[in-house]
């Protein structure tokens, strides 16, 4: 559901829309209708508790309707590349603490440890996850088969018992996908 009003799209709340922007405003007791024609509840969403960290920013607590709307507006196709290829290459070749390049394991850990709280909303989380996955999987230099192999090996390591995992990790250090 894409909102045609820019105010609805950015806030996700009809309460933040000026009265002149809403259709059907007046003193009637009928529920208000948005531009799509669905009925909106008359009660406003509950105010955040003062003890919560988001109390100062009421827009930070998404309503179920706003969360569903934001999820539906996420791009399904490839996102436009906003980072210059040179900057992306520099991010991949940034030396680590020992002066060596960061390896795929470092980028894999960054991808797996990313949390939604680290982002400023679903679109930013999507963008960051996409960038972290590109840094880890390197689709510019690896084939689809190599990427699938990396994902399957990681999942296998996650489900193996501890003893088998230790043997597999020792074997894996001998055979690495370079890139």
Swiss-Prot record:
SMART domains associated with the record: SCAN
Gene Ontology CC terms: nucleus
A Pfam family annotated for this UniProt entry: SCAN
The keyword Oxidoreductase appears for this protein: no
Main location class: nucleus
Ranges of biased composition (kind: Low complexity): 52-80
Keyword Nucleus among UniProt keywords: yes
Database matches in Gene3D superfamilies: DNA breaking-rejoining enzymes
Cell compartments where the protein resides: Nucleus
Keyword terms: Nucleus
Residues annotated as domain SCAN box: 108-166
InterPro entries found in the cross-reference section: SCAN-C2H2_zinc_finger, SCAN_dom, SCAN_sf
Annotated region described as Disordered, given as residue ranges: 1-107
Subunit description: Interacts with ZNF202.
Function: May regulate transcriptional activity.
Protein name: SCAN domain-containing protein 1
Species, as recorded: Pan paniscus
């Amino acid at each position: 559901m894409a909102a045609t009003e820019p105010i609805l799209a950015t806030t996700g709340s009809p309460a933040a829309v000026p009265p002149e922007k809403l259709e059907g405003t007046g003193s009637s007791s009928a529920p208000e209708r948005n531009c799509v024609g669905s009925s909106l509840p008359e009660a406003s969403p509950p105010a955040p508790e003062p003890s919560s960290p988001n109390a100062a920013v009421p827009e930070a607590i998404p309503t179920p309707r706003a969360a569903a709307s934001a999820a539906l507006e996420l791009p399904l196709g490839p996102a436009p590349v906003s980072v210059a290829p040179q900057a992306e290459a520099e991010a991949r070749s940034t030396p680590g603490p020992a002066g060596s390049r960061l390896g795929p394991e470092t980028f894999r850990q960054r991808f797996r440890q990313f949390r939604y709280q680290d982002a400023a909303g679903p679109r930013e989380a999507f963008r960051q996850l996409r960038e972290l996955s590109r840094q880890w999987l390197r689709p510019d230099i690896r084939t689809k088969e190599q990427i699938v192999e990396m994902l399957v090996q990681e999942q296998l390591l996650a489900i193996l018992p501890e003893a088998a995992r230790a043997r597999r990790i020792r074997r894996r250090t001998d055979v690495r996908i370079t890139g």
